[in-house]
Curated annotation (Swiss-Prot):
The keyword Cytoplasm applies. One of its GO terms (cellular component) is cytoplasm. Its EC number is 2.4.2.7. The gene is apt. It is an enzyme of class 2 (transferase). Pfam families: Pribosyltran. PROSITE patterns: PUR_PYR_PR_TRANSFER. It comes from the Bacteria. Catalyzes a salvage reaction resulting in the formation of AMP, that is energically less costly than de novo synthesis. The lineage of its organism: Bacteria, Pseudomonadati, Campylobacterota, Epsilonproteobacteria, Campylobacterales. Keywords: Cytoplasm, Glycosyltransferase, Purine salvage, Transferase. Pathway: Purine metabolism; AMP biosynthesis via salvage pathway; AMP from adenine: step 1/1. Gene3D superfamilies: 3.40.50.2020. This is Adenine phosphoribosyltransferase.
């Protein structure tokens, strides 16, 4: 990935102080989506990264992982599978809990997400990797469906939080921008 693209992406992402709570500097990728040529460059760069890896599906984490993941799946000509918050998928699901700062939450995937095929090759994608809780839970769901996660991909990885290190212990991890 070239440095010019990285700089353009950084410039296009809005930072919002004290959101969703005091002390957090939120990285808002919705502003990137206002620049179609830049968004196309991002998806083209990710397509180039994954094209030769024989990926069968892109798995996107709710909600901004849907934006990146569906565009990348389209570019690669592969299927897209959503990982959603508990209770949002209509058919039979598998569920995985994960810890939050205060309490826990759960995410789900349809039990037939990969058309019932075992051993499919997937890339997990989301906009941002912070603590790694949601991504690690997503990996468990992928594993439970007997799929192989080739790589976990994030537009942004927050270096000061443990997510990058925790995920790298389980799967190859790629963060386009490390902040």
């Amino acid at each position: 990935m070239n440095e010019t693209l990285k700089e353009e992406l950084l410039q296009s992402i809005r930072e919002v102080k004290d959101y969703p709570k005091k002390g957090i500097l939120f990285k808002d990728i919705t502003t990137l989506l206002n620049y179609p040529k830049l968004f196309n460059k991002l998806i083209d760069a990710l397509k180039k990264r994954y094209l030769a890896l024989n990926i069968d599906f892109i798995v996107g984490i709710e909600a901004r992982g849907f934006i990146l993941g569906s565009a990348l799946a389209y570019a690669l000509g592969v299927g897209f599978v959503p990982v959603r918050k508990k209770g949002k998928l209509p058919a039979h699901t598998l569920s995985q809990s994960y810890s939050l700062e205060y309490g826990s939450d759960s995410i789900e995937i349809h039990s037939d997400a990969f058309r019932g095929v075992k051993g499919v090759r997937v890339v997990l994608i989301d906009d941002l990797l912070a603590t790694g809780g949601t991504a690690l839970a997503s990996l468990e769901l992928i594993k439970a469906l007997q799929a192989e996660c080739i790589e976990a991909c994030f537009l942004i990885g927050l270096k000061e939080l443990p997510g990058i290190q925790l995920l790298e212990e389980r799967v190859k991890t790629f963060c386009l921008l490390e902040c």
